[in-house]
Amino acid sequence: MTAIIDIIGREILDSRGNPTVEVDVHLEDGSFGRAAVPSGASTGAHEAVELRDGGTRYLGKGVERAVDAVNGEIFEAIGGLDAENQIQIDRTMIELDGTPNKSRLGANAILGVSLAVAKAAAEASGLPLYRYVGGPNAHLLPVPMMNIINGGAHADNPIDFQEFMIMPVGAETLKDAVRMGSEVFHTLKKQLAADGHNTNVGDEGGFAPGLASAPAALDFIMKSIEKAGYKPGEDMYVALDCASTEFFKDGKYVLEGEGRTLEPGAMAEYLAELAGKYPIISIEDGMAEDDWDGWKSLTDLVGNKCQLVGDDLFVTNSARLRDGIKMGVANSILVKVNQIGSLSETLDAVETAHKARYTAVMSHRSGETEDSTIADLAVATNCGQIKTGSLARSDRLAKYNQLIRIEEQLGPQAQYAGRSVLRG
């Protein structure tokens, strides 16, 4: 009854107006699942390959080759298989691709099918996706990392670091956390406008003011938290995504906005200094993706009191994560479904992290759609944290709104992660 009878891939547009893959999966019993694949702006060198067409169409960014793979080879390989056998289906597609990074069929093709299959199987079972994937213990609503100031590859301003986020750990519920974040977001907008800064929003809904340094951005955020009626370091904490690989050149960290170049040891000390001065509880990609020694220095400096998240470092890849665990590097993994390219591999990465007492943060990409799958996956994995943008743009709010619905569905079972994400 849950056999796959049809798969339809199509090319749609993401939140940046670039093509991406959407997949529909139909089962024998009439159940249906649909998934759209996200896309990143700052991508790690070790990520699975997002297949693009090249040529002039969509300036080379078309995904017709990936769509053809969905409608052709992939359907031929998994048509007739039971949608409830997720691991078998994912393995079949990975083996069909035959490359270590999914470069032949494209991670965007494989992931679209993988997620749509899970959604169809969830519908067939009569369960919401978070319950189908996570089982009866899926109940933890994640603390949002809300990206309210953008820099780096996400903005046309001098700020070197890519994201400055607020985390409303003092909220009682997810719904309250969203409200608190919204209040700070709108307060920040007023503060920026009053100081003559542009308040247009970037790819992920955050502001991109013409500030020159991380401390300048953090000072604005501190004022906005207080102005909104909350206490920094009590009700609200801060998270950074440095995206350091983007400014790591010839073995050094080139902070153009701040007008200085730092050796890896000095970069680690700078981040430790910021974490000491501001209520920063999470730093993502504080060091570059292949600067393992720098990562070790940073971990030794602040790893006991600050969450150190590997994004480009681990790329949702269990093998790279295991290497990091052995070396005592970082203490958390950012989970992006399209970095690895299948649901089962994503779940394996989260499980690997949790077994090693590393935290996991479910994450969007800068190019998103209205698809809210990652909200369900955050609850399914009980990971306790989600990074899905600011309090603007419907492609970001789709995830927050889905989390509000899930919290409502769970009723008394629902638990907001809140202060449990604090270290030390």
Swiss-Prot record:
Q: What would be one Gene Ontology cellular-component term for the protein? A: phosphopyruvate hydratase complex
Relay the cofactor remark from the entry: Binds a second Mg(2+) ion via substrate during catalysis.
- Single annotated GO MF: magnesium ion binding
Family annotation (Pfam families) = Enolase_C, Enolase_N
Keywords, A to Z, come to: Cytoplasm, Glycolysis, Lyase, Magnesium, Metal-binding, Secreted
Its Enzyme Commission number(s) read: 4.2.1.11
Instruction: Give the pathway.
Output: Carbohydrate degradation; glycolysis; pyruvate from D-glyceraldehyde 3-phosphate: step 4/5
Positions annotated to bind Mg(2+)? 241, 284, 311
- Cofactor(s) required, per the database record: Mg(2+)
Q: Where does (2R)-2-phosphoglycerate bind?
A: 162, 336, 365-366, 387
A GO biological process of this protein is:
glycolytic process
Give the residue spans that cross the bilayer: none
Main enzyme class: lyase
Q: Where in the cell is it found?
A: Cytoplasm; Secreted; Cell surface
So where's the catalytic machinery, residue-wise? 204, 336
Q: Which reaction does it catalyse?
A: (2R)-2-phosphoglycerate = phosphoenolpyruvate + H2O
Q: What is its main location?
A: cytoplasm
> What job does the chain carry out?
Catalyzes the reversible conversion of 2-phosphoglycerate (2-PG) into phosphoenolpyruvate (PEP). It is essential for the degradation of carbohydrates via glycolysis.
Similarity comment text for this entry: Belongs to the enolase family.
* Cited HAMAP family: Enolase
Record's protein name: Enolase
